[in-house]
Every structure is written in structure tokens, then in C-alpha cells.
Swiss-Prot record:
CDD domains: PSTD1 (cd02577). The active site is at residue 89. This is Probable tRNA pseudouridine synthase D. One of its GO terms (molecular function) is RNA binding. It comes from Methanopyrus kandleri (strain AV19 / DSM 6324 / JCM 9639 / NBRC 100938). It comes from the Archaea.
């Protein structure tokens, strides 16, 4: 198993990502590019009356789900009462709309949580769901940028209307990109390897305490009671697994079930995304276009697509189909493996995604010799780091 494709990395210091990362629910069109943003719209379910309160959440250095859980804890509500339209990057100033059921706006307005800003906006008839998000607007300042190739790159992106639609590093874990590795073992139903990878696979960007604990457990696999004592408290998900293994040392499948459902599903989705990136990389390497289809392609809105493999996936024909079959064979997985019989709730039917990510309203402003501010909008599911990589290049180094 490889690390995520180098296409997902950027060798830059991002000073401020998404300071105004607003979902375009308010207006009819993007002020930057005129793109109609009314599909889907928030009205009429969002506004007026209803059992849900719609609020605006601005956060910094918080995972979206951890921020929601912290707010839920402060309100003494279950996190399932909350609705979000999408996940936002942790290491950025991000803004998004959230709903919560049964909490008056005045109560929300009085909440004070560090690095979280909560502003009530009104009532809603139902909770927010991922389908309610058109996309995001990004304002990103990059220092240490090599701007020499930027004019040509901007011209290419504008001519194509976008960039290759890679999944960004966030999909795999920015500091510890192991989710796709765990996901492969989940798909293969090798529960011990899935658990061992999640607990012990080291990445240098972690804290010294976490690295030391993982290294010790890797060398003393099976000594779970002592590992529980050594793993720091902030590794709460790892500790949930270790608590189970300390009592039931060989029950790896139920230890894995100690993780929340959304995390367990995230592993499978990350592996699907890894396969998508591999297939897309090979398509480009073979000279096949991403902005127009060739014979055998499965298309969506006139664009060629790449599969997120699953047990219902129908592979392409022609040269694209050859690539898809070769990558699956090299990985040692079959489409039917995504029907996970021992944990069926994680089964993945599969999907397809365009090979091209549309970029709207792209602008670049030089600030000094080596600093650039980019402004652009992406549909939901698009990664800003993917756009930056195409504009500024990558040597396969993690972003700070």
C-alpha cells in the first residue's frame, strides 16, 4: 500500500485557508463568476419557522465533527440533533451553516467556546444534509510560492475550465494519512491488520507522545493493557479500541466496532478515494484527456468519469476500462469485496465522479515577491489543495 498519490500534496505554507469559506445558500449566483448556485437551494425549508435553529459556525483548529460534539456537550444535546452540509478543514479559518434541533437561538448566542464563533441565523423546518451544499468559496494566501509558472498554469486551468479532480490529502488524514490503508484491510475483512494499522502505523508529523506509544505497541503487539496505560489521553479513539482489547485480546472485529460509525465508514471511503486517485493519475499518464470523453468512457454532464469502486460498480470500456481493471488487480481487491459481509453497515456500492474539477471565478493576486492570494469557488466535494497543486506544482511534500 502506497501513500496517497503525490498529486494530493503541496509544498507550501498556507497562511489562511477559507477565511470566508461560505456555502452559497444566500444568493442566486456566485458574486465571483455568476454561476447559478440554486441547485439545491435552502428555501423553503430554511427560514421562517421550524423545530431546528440554523446557525453560522466559524472555527479554527477544530475538526468539524469534534466542534459539533463540543457544542452538543455544552448544550447537553446528542450530536445526532445537529445537521451539517459538509466537512471543513481543521487547519484553517472556516465558516459553515449548522442546524440543531430544539435549542432556542438565544441559548446558542450565549455559548462561548474557544476558537469557535456561533451566530444564530433563524429557524429551519429540517436539519441540514450534505446535499444542501452547492460548494465553497476559498480565499487562500500562500507564502513561499514559486510564481514563475503561475501565468501559464492559470491560462491552462481557465482553458480547461478546471483541474484534475483528485481527492486532497485531507481525505486521507493531513497529519497521519493512514485512513486509506486501514480502509483496504476493512474491505478485505482483515480486522487484525485494520486495528493494528490504526493503532501502530507511525507518521513523523504526530506528537512525540503519540509516536512513542505507537512504536511501543508495534514492538509489543498483544500487550494491550500496558498499551492502554501508555497511549496519551488525547488519542481517544485509539483508547476506545485498546479498552476493548484489554478485556478481549483477540476480538479485533468488535474492538473496531468501538469506533463511531462515521469513522468506520470514513476508512472505506478513503480507500475508494485512493483508488480513484490512482486511476485518475494513470489516465493522465497515458495521455487521456480529463476535460472530454474518449471511446468507452462513462460520462456525467459531458465529462469523463472515474469510479469510486464498489460492489455495484460497472467498469468503463475502452482504455479507461483497462486502467480501472489493472489498478484493481494491482491492489489485489475485487469489486465484490466492497460488500463487507462481516460488517455489512460499511459496505459500499460505489459511485463515479468527473475526472475534471470545475473551478469558478479563479483569481490570483501577487502580494510581494513570493506571496500569492488566490480566490476561487468549487462545487461540493472539490479540494482547494488540488487546485493549488496544479497552479503551483508539487514535490510531494506535506503542507504545513
Amino acid at each position: 500500500m502506497e501513500k496517497p498519490s503525490r498529486n494530493t500534496y503541496i509544498p507550501l505554507t498556507i497562511v489562511g485557508e477559507c477565511p470566508e469559506c461560505r456555502e452559497y445558500h444566500r444568493g442566486r449566483e456566485c458574486p465571483e463568476c455568476g454561476q447559478d448556485l440554486r441547485r439545491p437551494r435552502l428555501r423553503p425549508q430554511f427560514g421562517g419557522r421550524g423545530p431546528h435553529t440554523l446557525f453560522y459556525l466559524e472555527k479554527y483548529d477544530w475538526d468539524t465533527m469534534k466542534a459539533v460534539r463540543r457544542i452538543a456537550q455544552a448544550l447537553r444535546k446528542h450530536h445526532r440533533h445537529f445537521g451539517i452540509a459538509g466537512m471543513k478543514d481543521k487547519r484553517a479559518v472556516t465558516s459553515q451553516r449548522v442546524t440543531v434541533r430544539g435549542v432556542p437561538p438565544g441559548v446558542l448566542a450565549r455559548l462561548r467556546i474557544r476558537d469557535l464563533k456561533i451566530v444564530p441565523m433563524g429557524r429551519a423546518r429540517r436539519k441540514l444534509r450534505p446535499g444542501d451544499l452547492w460548494g465553497n468559496r476559498f480565499v487562500i494566501t500562500v507564502r513561499g510560492a514559486k510564481v514563475r509558472r503561475l501565468p501559464e498554469a492559470l491560462r491552462t486551468v481557465r482553458e480547461l475550465g478546471g483541474v484534475p479532480n483528485y481527492y486532497g490529502l485531507q481525505r486521507f488524514g493531513s497529519r497521519r494519512p493512514v485512513t486509506h490503508v486501514v480502509g483496504k484491510y476493512v474491505v478485505l475483512e482483515d480486522w487484525e491488520k485494520a486495528v493494528k494499522t490504526f493503532l501502530t502505523l507511525e507518521y513523523p508529523r504526530e506528537s512525540p507522545e503519540a509516536l512513542e506509544a505507537r512504536r511501543w505497541l508495534k514492538e509489543h503487539w498483544g500487550e494491550f493493557k500496558e498499551a492502554l496505560r501508555r497511549f496519551p489521553k488525547f488519542l481517544d479513539y485509539e483508547r476506545h479500541i485498546l479498552e476493548h482489547l484489554a478485556r478481549h485480546p483477540h476480538d479485533y472485529i468488535n474492538a473496531f466496532r468501538r469506533l463511531p460509525m462515521w469513522i468506520r465508514r470514513m476508512f472505506v471511503h478513503a480507500y475508494q478515494s485512493y483508488l480513484f486517485n490512482r486511476i485518475l493519475s494513470e489516465r493522465i499518464a497515458r495521455g487521456l484527456p480529463v476535460h472530454r470523453p474518449v471511446e468507452g468512457d462513462v460520462t456525467q454532464d459531458g465529462l469523463p468519469t472515474v469510479p469510486l469502486p464498489g460492489f455495484r460498480t460497472e467498469l468503463s470500456d475502452g482504455p479507461q476500462g483497462e486502467i480501472e481493471r489493472e489498478v484493481l488487480e494491482e491492489e489485489g481487491v475485487r469489486l465484490e469485496d466492497f460488500e463487507i459481509k462481516s460488517m455489512p453497515e460499511l459496505s459500499a456500492g460505489g459511485d463515479r465522479k468527473p475526472a475534471l474539477l470545475r473551478v469558478y471565478g479563479l483569481r490570483a493576486e501577487a502580494i510581494g515577491d513570493d506571496t500569492v492570494r488566490f480566490t476561487f469557488s468549487l462545487p461540493r466535494g472539490g479540494y482547494a489543495t488540488t487546485v493549488l497543486r496544479e497552479l503551483l506544482g508539487s514535490e510531494g511534500v506535506y503542507a504545513d
